[in-house]
Amino acid sequence: MLTITPNFAQERALRLLRSEWKSHRTFMISSPTGSGKTALAAFITHGCNSRNMRVMFVVPYTILIEQTAARFIDYGIPMEDIGFVWRDHPNYDPTRLIQIASADTLIRREFPDNIDLLFIDEAHLRRKKLLEVIRDNEFKVIGLSGTPFSPFLGTYYERLIKPTTMKELIERGDLSPYEFYAPTKPDLSAVKSTSSAEYGSDYKEAEIAAIMSGADLVGDVVDNWLANGQNLPTICFCVTVSHANFVTVAFNWAGVNAEIITADTPHEERQLIIHRFEQGGTKIIVNVGTLVAGFDSDVRC
């Protein structure tokens, strides 16, 4: 028995899914941060498990594996129903009704043949082998994303479910209103792009990092934060590690306590940085692709 009840966005999503369930096999649920996509997945998973159906929930980042399991358990799903597909996790058990899987681990193994429903979290991230799994099987698939704007998604997901919008969540008070400040616009016209079957097209990292690390642009970022950031807890996203180091040093020179987290930052050190951030000792965490999901600290800028 779950310990939570659906909020307004989850009620809408469940109603829309029920009305389309028999007509389509694959669904994309487009819903912003703060709307409760993980809880929505828990409601659907609980319903499937009550009919002895097996569910797999695939996440793109390792930080989301234990976090998703913890959320499911908090919502009332029994811990003994959850197995893990992640490296050599001690709770690997393919017989359990719920499998929480790392995308990187899953695509390197033979896909299980007993799954009835597959969730793809952060489904806008292109993983070629996962897309092949969606295409080549007959089980139901639900993609979850706050930004499902990539054109390739329409090839694999038949039906779009959009239960709410960021505007509605802000008007209800579920999300904070926001302001944009962009004092300097970098010239990216000469930056080349690169593409791959796995991740699609994007700017070349080295070229865009050189522009984003320009002294004028970084200086404007620091000056703008000092003028408008109001000393609020802040997350800064950078292109490369060298870019992040440059930005961190610039904030430190300005007297702002900023720290850096990258993919190579050990887990224990990362937790200490986050703890200092939550306690107010660190004002800014500068990161490179590490705090893009599953970061629950209070951030105001």
What label would you give each PLM region?
Residues M1-S30:
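Conserved pre-motif I regulatory segment
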Residues S23-T45, F237, I261:
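Walker A/P-loop
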Residues T38-F43, G47-D74, V241-S242:
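Conserved Walker A/P-loop ATP-binding site and its immediately adjacent core
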Residues E66, D81-P94, I235, A244-N252, ...:
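Conserved helicase ATPase core of P-loop NTP-dependent helicases/translocases
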Residues I73-F111:
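Inter-Walker segment of RecA-like/P-loop motor cores
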Residues N114-L117, K283-V288, A293-C301:
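A short beta-strand element within the Helicase C-terminal
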Residues E122-Y181:
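Post-DEXD/H (motif II) to motif III coupling segment of the RecA-like Helicase ATP-binding lobe
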Residues L160-C238:
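Conserved interdomain linker/interface between the two RecA-like ATPase lobes of SF2 helicase motors
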